Amino acid sequence: KGALTVTFTAPTERGTDRLILRLWPNGGPYASAGAHLFVSRVREGNRPLPVSYPDPTTLVIARPVAAGEQVVVSMNWRLLLPRETGLRMKGGGRSVRLGSFFPLLAWDGNDWALDPSTKFPSAEAWTTPIADFDVRVTQPAHLRVLASGQQIAPGKWRAQAVRDFTLALGRFEIVKGTAHVPASVRVTVGLEAFPGAEPVRLFLRRAILSLERYSALYGPYPWHTYTVVTMADLIGLTGGLEYPTLVYQPATSENVPHETAHQWFYSLVGNDQARDPWLDEGLATWAEAAVNGAPPFPDATIPPEVTNRIGEPMSFWDQFDTRRYFLGAYLQSSRALLSLGPRSQVDCAIRLYVIDNAYRIARPHDLLDALQTFFPDAEQKLEAYGAHF
């Protein structure tokens, strides 16, 4: 359980008639596994605010905010963790994982994001703005917390200019290193012990290599810390989970380059992950080759039912299994980018996309604008793969 205070400033050009926060533990596979996020005592100062719940994942606060006005709203929350493992939230056993676990402001820079949740346990359908987080955590003394941002004092964490906050609680083997991007970034890996777990220093080496390579290609990693937490209940390719400055990996396998690429594509440059999942997943899959030396799964065949559908929303992908979602949205989007021309030029265009859209919620036309600087026929080629602009 906890308490949350949110500060929101409406755009100077227009206001809003409400505030909306999303309660993601109440939807999709989380609710099915027994999770629930309760909210109480929503207030401004000492004044209670009226609220409504159009659906279990949506909290509407009836507080109009004029153009340029700043409002500070507080609330209490209580979370029941899911009974199942392998999700973005985990309780029980020897560890706890909390991802997108508290009421999240759903502002996309222009309006409120009201997309439904997805059925996939490791996928996400949320859109969140850049924010500064100051977090106080109380935990048993024998357990360690690893969290987004920096620990600034015992039990106090600060994460600046990020879209979300996550933490893991448990017993971890810790190793640390430094990436040069070129500024120094403190890299921490926490490994939850598990039979067959990969060596903890493998994760550290791959994290440092990925940060340095992507910083050279797409612009410097802008935060001071980066953390990789490997956990025993996460499995296979779908076990990687990305959050700003912290990612999760299965203890028995490693795909650090993909999750690290999300620090540029989702974290630094945001997107509506329900409407345009190819923007972050396709670009992260594309970027992997810069670290791994070759594109992933070069011999894989795209199933006909998802061929040339890269631009579809999560509501489309929800009808398929995880394998077809990966092949159709992740891998096929990467191949669509490769169809444009030389990889080095595509990387230059993506760097421009990052520069122009850092700390914003990007849309497909923002990526197209950057690509057309180098490839005038980019729209035609990407539309052939099913992109929508």
Q: Can you say where each PLM-predicted feature lies in the sequence?
A:
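Early extracytoplasmic/domain-onset interaction patches
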Residues: 1-22, 336
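Solvent-exposed beta-hairpin/edge-strand motifs
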Residues: 16-48, 98-99, 138-144
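Extended, low-hydrophobicity, Ser/Thr/Pro/Gly-biased non-transmembrane segments
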Residues: 24, 76-168
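A surface-exposed beta-strand-loop module
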Residues: 30-94
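Zn2+-dependent metallopeptidase catalytic core
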Residues: 64-66, 76, 123-145, 157, ...
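Juxtacatalytic substrate-recognition/specificity segment
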Residues: 135, 173-276
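Acidic/His/Gly-enriched intrinsically disordered linker/tail segments
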Residues: 275-339, 357-360, 378-389
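Pan-zinc metallopeptidase signature
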Residues: 344-389
